[in-house]
Amino acid sequence: MSDLQDQEPSIIINGNLEPVGEPDIVEETEVVAQETQETQDADKPKKKVAFTGLEEDGETEEEKRKREFEEGGGLPEQPLNPDFSKLNPLSAEIINRQATINIGTIGHVAHGKSTVVRAISGVQTVRFKDELERNITIKLGYANAKIYKCQEPTCPEPDCYRSFKSDKEISPKCQRPGCPGRYKLVRHVSFVDCPGHDILMSTMLSGAAVMDAALLLIAGNESCPQPQTSEHLAAIEIMKLKHVIILQNKVDLMREESALEHQKSILKFIRGTIADGAPIVPISAQLKYNIDAVNEFIVKTIPVPPRDFMISPRLIVIRSFDVNKPGAEIEDLKGGVAGGSILNGVFKLGDEIEIRPGIVTKDDKGKIQCKPIFSNIVSLFAEQNDLKFAVPGGLIGVGTKVDPTLCRADRLVGQVVGAKGHLPNIYTDIEINYFLLRRLLGVKTDGQKQAKVRKLEPNEVLMVNIGSTATGARVVAVKADMARLQLTSPACTEINEKIALSRRIEKHWRLIGWATIKKGTTLEPIA
């Protein structure tokens, strides 16, 4: 054993046992020098290095993006005072910076509505803390997208359609490998992302008030129809939306045979509804499969509605907020911002505006009174694009000189903004001509059959959606298909406007029908 310990350490080289002597200091120094040289070489920027963002000609990613932006025509400024009688919703002066059509996403909870919007627009609509924690949409989400078509005749459909964010240049290069063409902007769409949860039905109805068309999401891995699928379809039927595209989502989780069977159940479900004959597009929103086909159907099957730019402008408020950071200096404070969709007319920078009903209070006798808010428009925005004027379509942020405390946390939601002195009357009670659904939608009873809708009864409390206003209403009197409702809070509306009616069933508001306003008691605003 001791003899073995005394032996010099050795290794086998070419079959011979060779002794291992002391390490050669010179060789080690050479190795260290060689490693140092290799490290230094690695630190030198190569022709294309991912972490520095350098391209072969020394151009950074940011510089490349700027160059492509300029080559694609950039994003031209809007003219200050254009002739609105000569403009239409697809005019370059408008469509380059602002969406001109509102498309809603509707369907049952967790069927992929927000994911589809993100796949098309690249914008995450789920933003709030509560929404991110639960992974559901709670408030209405908004995202704008530009849809382009390649002008190269050899570029095949639907590959030639591509969507980008709303700040994209007007004529980018085609992204299909080997295609020399450039894209042309054909649509600028604003998506209204509605919540699918049953308890958020009133939020969905507020969103339906501004929709021009809808994408109905139906998940392929669940039976059709789910409760809110039918409830949302009834809601857009009430709003008389004629243009619907059905997206059969999550096809990546199914076999071909089951996808075809599921499609048959969709066709059976939509028979006789407003969506009868609508295209059914199989997609995977997560994998962005068939999204180019969705873009093609949006362009080909959903026309941009005609807009009248010459009449008095009106906007319904769907969001409002205070943009000031806590602790901001007094001279840096900005006025409140109202976000909403313009129904008709054109708003311009500097316009005098009126917000109705405004500040609602009660006098000494407990009688409701309204004080409209007057202000000026100081800024107009469509997402990140600043505007000189704004037309109907898309969500517009209107910067005002209004006290920001009146706007924070959606306090202006349901109000109507318009030119001073040109807004409709404020009503405290209304007389309606109503129509009830035959069966209750979105509720599964014990026998899996839908319950019948009861007739309206005096003194019962309903929820009515007038535009983006959701307010309580007590039934004062009922006769045949006419009823008189006393509103909990006053609403700025017009005769012959369509409203949605909901009743509280099992602690949730459920859609039971719709109505048309025939007349009502107006409230004179205080000066």
Curated annotation (Swiss-Prot):
<dbReference type="GO" id="GO:0005525">
    <property type="term" value="F:GTP binding"/>
</dbReference>
<dbReference type="GO" id="GO:0016282">
    <property type="term" value="C:eukaryotic 43S preinitiation complex"/>
</dbReference>
<dbReference type="Pfam" id="PF00009">
    <property type="entry name" value="GTP_EFTU"/>
</dbReference>
<comment type="subunit">
    <text>Eukaryotic translation initiation factor 2 eIF2 is a heterotrimeric complex composed of an alpha, a beta and a gamma subunit. The factors eIF-1, eIF-1A, eIF-2, eIF-3, TIF5/eIF-5 and methionyl-tRNAi form a multifactor complex (MFC) that may bind to the 40S ribosome. Interacts (via C-terminus) with CDC123; the interaction is direct. Interacts with GCD1. Interacts with the eIF2B complex subunits GCD6 and GCD7. Interacts with methionyl-initiator methionine tRNA.</text>
</comment>
<feature type="binding site">
    <location>
        <begin position="249"/>
        <end position="252"/>
    </location>
    <ligand>
        <name>GTP</name>
    </ligand>
</feature>
<dbReference type="GO" id="GO:0001731">
    <property type="term" value="P:formation of translation preinitiation complex"/>
</dbReference>
<protein>
    <recommendedName>
        <fullName>Eukaryotic translation initiation factor 2 subunit gamma</fullName>
        <ecNumber>3.6.5.3</ecNumber>
    </recommendedName>
</protein>
<dbReference type="InterPro" id="IPR009000">
    <property type="entry name" value="Transl_B-barrel_sf"/>
</dbReference>
<dbReference type="InterPro" id="IPR015256">
    <property type="entry name" value="eIF2g_C"/>
</dbReference>
<keyword id="KW-0342">GTP-binding</keyword>
<comment type="similarity">
    <text>Belongs to the TRAFAC class translation factor GTPase superfamily. Classic translation factor GTPase family. EIF2G subfamily.</text>
</comment>
<dbReference type="InterPro" id="IPR044128">
    <property type="entry name" value="eIF2g_GTP-bd"/>
</dbReference>
<dbReference type="InterPro" id="IPR009001">
    <property type="entry name" value="Transl_elong_EF1A/Init_IF2_C"/>
</dbReference>
<dbReference type="GO" id="GO:0006413">
    <property type="term" value="P:translational initiation"/>
</dbReference>
<feature type="binding site">
    <location>
        <begin position="284"/>
        <end position="286"/>
    </location>
    <ligand>
        <name>GTP</name>
    </ligand>
</feature>
<keyword id="KW-0396">Initiation factor</keyword>
<dbReference type="GO" id="GO:0031369">
    <property type="term" value="F:translation initiation factor binding"/>
</dbReference>
<dbReference type="GO" id="GO:0033290">
    <property type="term" value="C:eukaryotic 48S preinitiation complex"/>
</dbReference>
<feature type="region of interest" description="G4">
    <location>
        <begin position="249"/>
        <end position="252"/>
    </location>
</feature>
<dbReference type="GO" id="GO:0005850">
    <property type="term" value="C:eukaryotic translation initiation factor 2 complex"/>
</dbReference>
<feature type="binding site">
    <location>
        <begin position="110"/>
        <end position="115"/>
    </location>
    <ligand>
        <name>GTP</name>
    </ligand>
</feature>
<dbReference type="InterPro" id="IPR044127">
    <property type="entry name" value="eIF2g_dom_2"/>
</dbReference>
<feature type="region of interest" description="Interacts with CDC123">
    <location>
        <begin position="515"/>
        <end position="527"/>
    </location>
</feature>
<dbReference type="GO" id="GO:1990856">
    <property type="term" value="F:methionyl-initiator methionine tRNA binding"/>
</dbReference>
<dbReference type="GO" id="GO:0005829">
    <property type="term" value="C:cytosol"/>
</dbReference>
<dbReference type="InterPro" id="IPR004161">
    <property type="entry name" value="EFTu-like_2"/>
</dbReference>
<dbReference type="GO" id="GO:0003743">
    <property type="term" value="F:translation initiation factor activity"/>
</dbReference>
<dbReference type="InterPro" id="IPR000795">
    <property type="entry name" value="T_Tr_GTP-bd_dom"/>
</dbReference>
<dbReference type="InterPro" id="IPR050543">
    <property type="entry name" value="eIF2G"/>
</dbReference>
<keyword id="KW-0963">Cytoplasm</keyword>
<feature type="region of interest" description="G2">
    <location>
        <begin position="135"/>
        <end position="139"/>
    </location>
</feature>
<dbReference type="InterPro" id="IPR027417">
    <property type="entry name" value="P-loop_NTPase"/>
</dbReference>
<comment type="function">
    <text>As a subunit of eukaryotic initiation factor 2 eIF2, involved in the early steps of protein synthesis. In the presence of GTP, eIF-2 forms a ternary complex with initiator tRNA Met-tRNAi and then recruits the 40S ribosomal complex and initiation factors eIF-1, eIF-1A and eIF-3 to form the 43S pre-initiation complex (43S PIC), a step that determines the rate of protein translation. The 43S PIC binds to mRNA and scans downstream to the initiation codon, where it forms a 48S initiation complex by codon-anticodon base pairing.</text>
</comment>
<keyword id="KW-0597">Phosphoprotein</keyword>
<dbReference type="GO" id="GO:0003924">
    <property type="term" value="F:GTPase activity"/>
</dbReference>
<keyword id="KW-0648">Protein biosynthesis</keyword>
<feature type="region of interest" description="G3">
    <location>
        <begin position="193"/>
        <end position="196"/>
    </location>
</feature>
<dbReference type="Pfam" id="PF03144">
    <property type="entry name" value="GTP_EFTU_D2"/>
</dbReference>
<feature type="modified residue" description="Phosphoserine">
    <location>
        <position position="258"/>
    </location>
</feature>
<dbReference type="GO" id="GO:0043614">
    <property type="term" value="C:multi-eIF complex"/>
</dbReference>
<dbReference type="GO" id="GO:0005840">
    <property type="term" value="C:ribosome"/>
</dbReference>
<feature type="region of interest" description="G1">
    <location>
        <begin position="107"/>
        <end position="114"/>
    </location>
</feature>
